[in-house]
Amino acid sequence: MSRLLLRCLLLCCLALVAGCPKSASKGTALEELQYAYSAAVRWGDFEGAWNLVDPKVRQEQPLTDIDFSRYKQVQISGYRDLGGTTLGNGEVVRDIEIGVVNRHTLAERTVRYRERWRYDEAAKTWWLVGGLPDLWDER
């Protein structure tokens, strides 16, 4: 039930962002989407977070049910914004530190992740370019 409520809340946030007047700045829209994305990740709603990924990326690198089931094996214990910057091409990057707990072993670890966002003029929205965080990268 709480997952359904979280998804509805995320969709409402997206609808509000989409319905914002055109006078709203791109920066404000980006902050709102980043907040919605971070909330989805913090609450383990990776399917909801996937909806904020660039449609081109979703088409070229689709996630399977098995991929989503891997995300259900972990719990997010923290999501910290370490800072960001705007690149020359208009993209915005944000460094994130994510606390990850394995639900089976209860072992906690920290993963660093770089979000990359681009503004889509046609859709009048920001999209996450890099996909969902790889919580299993053993580098």
Segments the model singles out, each with a brief description of its role:
Residues 38-42, 46, 51-58, 99-102, ...:
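Sec-exported extracytoplasmic/periplasmic mature domains
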Residues 26-42:
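Short, aromatic-enriched amphipathic alpha-helices that serve as compact interaction elements
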Residues 87-139:
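Exposed beta-sheet edge and beta->alpha loop/turn motif
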Residues 1-9:
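Bacterial N-terminal signal peptides that target proteins for export
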Residues 16-19:
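C-terminal motif of bacterial Sec signal peptides marking the signal peptidase cleavage site
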Residues 31-32, 46-93, 106:
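Short solvent-exposed beta->alpha transition segments
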Residues 21-23:
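Bacterial signal peptide processing site
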